[in-house]
Every structure is written in C-alpha cells, then in structure tokens.
Amino acid sequence: PLDMLAALMGEGKKSIFYKNFVKSEKAIQANVGHPCRELSGEFHFTVLTFPDWQEDQGIYFNNIEADIRNTIAEWEEKGFTDEDLEMVKTEMISQSFDMKTSISSKASMISSWEWKGRGKHNVSTEINRYKNVTRADVMRVFNKYIKNRKAVINQVRPKSPFVKELDSLISRNPNANLILKEDPQYDNLIYKKSNSEFDACCRHTQPEASAPKTPKIPEFHKESFENGLKTIFSQTNEVPKVYIRLKINGGSLFEDSKKSGLSSITAQMMNESTQKKSSEDISVELQKLGSTVSFSSEDDMTVLLIECLSENYSKTLDLVEEKLLFPAFNDEDFKRIKKSNVEGLESMKKNSQYLAGSAMSNVLFGDTPFGRSMTEKSIKKIKVKDVKEFYNNYSPNISELVAVGNISKDDFYKELDFLRKWKNKNISIPTNFEFPEDNTTQIYLLDKEGASQSFILMGHKSNTYDTDGEYFKSQVMNKSLGGGASGRLFLNLREDKGFTYGAYSFYQGNKQTGMFGIQTSVKTEVTDSALTEIFSILDNYTNTGLTNEELSSTKESYLNSAAMKYETPNQKLGFLN
C-alpha cells in the first residue's frame, strides 16, 4: 500500500506534487518514493527547487517544508479515484516484469523473497499483491505513517552569488556531540569461525569455469518502408511486453553553432503536449496502460523509447502517433523547459566530470557539434520557432526502428501504418566536420573552487565505431590496460598506491568521431604522482604489450560474457540496432 501511496501522490504529470511544484515552476523536480528495506522503511518527499536568489524570477521559495506539508494536506482533501488506483496498479505490474528479464535479476528476486521470509517467489503472487490493494489500505497507511507525522528534514541550499558573507548559521549537524553508548547485548561476544568448505564470506577453492558457450543470436525480420524508414523486429516471449527504439539520426549535427542545446530542448518538448492533449492528459493515458513513451537527444541522434504491455500495444501506439506527428510546442511548456535547463546547467557546473568532459570534447573536436556544449547563453537564444524548425529534421529516411516483444510479426507491423505514412522530407545529415589537428601532449587545468579531489581526464581522438575492425580490436586491447578492476591502471593507482577508488581507460565512438580516454579521481595532494604513474603505465604497455596471462584472461572474459550478451530485451535492441 505504501508503494501505491507514493505513486498516487507523486507519479506522473497529473500528480499533485508535479502540479504544485514542477508545473508551477517552483521546482525542477518533485518526487515521492518508498525505498523499503528488510528491517526498516522510509517514505521520501524530495523537491529540487530553484534557488531563492534567482532575483530575475521575482519568486522566492523559502519554506519548502510548508509547501510539502500543504501539498500532502491537499492530496488528502482531494483524494483519489478508483481509476487512479487501477492506473498505478497497472503501471507497477508492468514495471515488475522488467525485473525479470535477466538471469541475474531473477536470481536476485528469488533469493530476496527467500531471505526476507516471504517464501518461494511466484510471479502471480507478486502481481496479486498489487491487485489486492484497496482504497482502505492506501488511506490506512497514509493515516498511520504520513499524516501529522514528524520527519527528518534535510535542506541543502546553494550559496547566493550576491552575498559575500553569510549572516547566519545555515547548517547544523544534530549528531555533532552525540555520545554513543555500548549495547550490552554485545558484551562478551566471541567470533566463531565457520568450518564449512563454503561459508558466508568465501569459497576456499575456486570453482572450475565451464567452457564458453556460443551465444544464441536472436532471430529477426527486416523490412524497409517506402518512405525510407528501416525496421527490424524480433519476437521474444520472456515477458508480456513490447520494447521499441526509434532512432532519428542527426541530433545536434543539425544545430546552429550559436544555439547549442536545440536538439535536446526539441526532444524535451516532444515529451510535452500534443495538438490534441495536454502533457498531463497523455501522462495519465500512458499510466493507465502501464506504458512509457519518451524522447531524448544524444550527440548525433534523437531517440524515442517505447515500452508497453503486449495487450496494450495498439493503444500505446495511438499515443505514440500523436506525440511523434502532432506535437504542440506550446509557449508555456517551452518557458518551463528552458528555465529547467538553465538551472540544470548551474547544477552541472558543480560536477567535475561534466566540466572535464566538456573541456575535453572542445579541445578534441573544436567548434563542431561534437565539441560544443549547451550553455546558458545558447539556451537563451533558442526560441519556440527554432524548435519548430528543428522538428522538420525528423524524417523517416534518416530513421531506424528496432523492436523486440511478446507479439507476432504480423500483429507488430499491422499497427505501424502511421509510420508508413510519415512524410519523407529527404533530409541529408551533415558530414565532413573539420576537427583541430592533434598536437603534442598538452595539460589543461580547470580550477574548481572547493574541490576535495582532482579529477583527471586525458585522451586523444581515435577510431570511429565498428563491430569487428580497428575499433573492436582497440576495445580488446584496452581490457587489460584499464577496462575494469583487473586492469593495470586500477591495480596500480588503487590497489598498490591507494590514490583512488578507481581508474579506468575507455574507447568511445560513433559514425564520425572516436576517442580514447583515461579517467580517475585522486586525492589533490597526489595529482602529480598519479599522472606520473599513468604515463609510466602507458609507456610500459606501449612498449611491451599484453602479457600472455592478460591475453588469456581477456579472451576468457569476452567469451564467457558473450553467453548472456543478448539475454534481455534491451540487450536485443542494442544488438539489432
């Protein structure tokens, strides 16, 4: 019932917390959650507001707690309908299937039920847990655990850039002078070591690994529509759901250099109102179906992800058609999204990895879509008409659709008539960008005031993406260098020197760019020593290459991990894409 209560209060754009905080532009996010544990539970109300000192907004939010408590009281007063309750039940049942798509998640679920005393795990039993929740159950837990209850309140406020010195104490640790008393139940406690060959902490003898198994490649059907849209479908009956990924190539490659972020903002606007329905109404319809439909933007593409129960596939695609082909691009939605993006950038400026990544991209790829980053200045230059013009780059001739699901091929394709009718605009994707020439080794310093450690990111341009060429071979080579906890970088900088919690190297690439990188966060005082070690490891690896043991371990790792490479629906989507 507490899960249901959290969903009723804060799930979706029609929820009271979304309406009172996000829709009203008081906050960037407002969430209600119930992170239940084995021996205890918590119920969270989390609101990420805009700072009080945003003077140009003329609105101040000094008492977040009062706003939250007033919203809770308003929810109780207005109540919820039986339709609302059925809606969140369907949504939770749909989400529960996602937890059973891999061997790992199934094993975790089965063991969790067992050691929490629930007995043997049964899918039908779990679904019935949600189905059997009543209105009385929801209100009972609300009255018992939420209404008029005390709470631990944690407010984190940013320092105002307009105030040089703080005139009052704004942070207090309630446990600063707490004296811990020893619990008498632990007096005279003696550790008794287990004599078992397999005890709770380890095996004494490492089990023999079985021979690698050839992965089972999913069967699939390919079909191209007359308007240029390419599709791939694979039937899988693991869970009663359908997963679809529509990739519209281009993304930020179409952006004006002075309006970086236009691709992202357009994708966010696609998640809002349509010409027929408000974003709140669409959110409710999707929740009723237990479906998810979301647009997002990456460097060189816009992605539409769709998840739905097989039984609701047709109704979900009706909403997809409306969102894809008939967006509204309302001024009200646009204003809120721009404001949220500006504040999001302010937050990202506190993230060392974001700052380093943005700087590295600019150094490697210069004034191109791959080197530019969204800024407050570029966001403010974007107008609604720019979004509408950018939307015209969405065309089937540069798009690919991949789907896997518990549905027949015929049933899948018969619902795609709206995509067959999607107008081909004969869009061409920009290519042949000019990147800066590679220079000798250079060091760039970014000063982040108050940083507790140094984030190191080093790299250079490298191969573009491929499945079995130089890019793939580079990935294999990188495994022993820094591809995981067994890599030389990790073993040296963490295990041997104790400079960091982790150090890794990586390759990443797409159709037009690629890079090799090394990253780690180290204690500030050992920054120079860490760099010395990294260069030493690179020199040694370049001169001597992999050892026979490392090569054997790399092969085993790739071969053994391949057995489950196409297990889950999302893994199948990635492979077919």
Language-model features, listed with the residues they occupy:
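Charge-rich, well-structured scaffold segments of protease-associated domains
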Residues: 1, 24-203, 281-428, 496-497, ...
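His/Glu-based metal-binding/catalytic segments typifying zinc-dependent metallopeptidases
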Residues: 1-14, 46, 180-204, 224, ...
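Thiolate-centered catalytic microenvironments shared by cysteine-dependent enzyme domains
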Residues: 21
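Edge strands and adjacent loops of beta-rich recognition modules
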Residues: 204-216
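Short pre-active-site segment immediately N-terminal to the catalytic Zn-binding motif
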Residues: 252-258
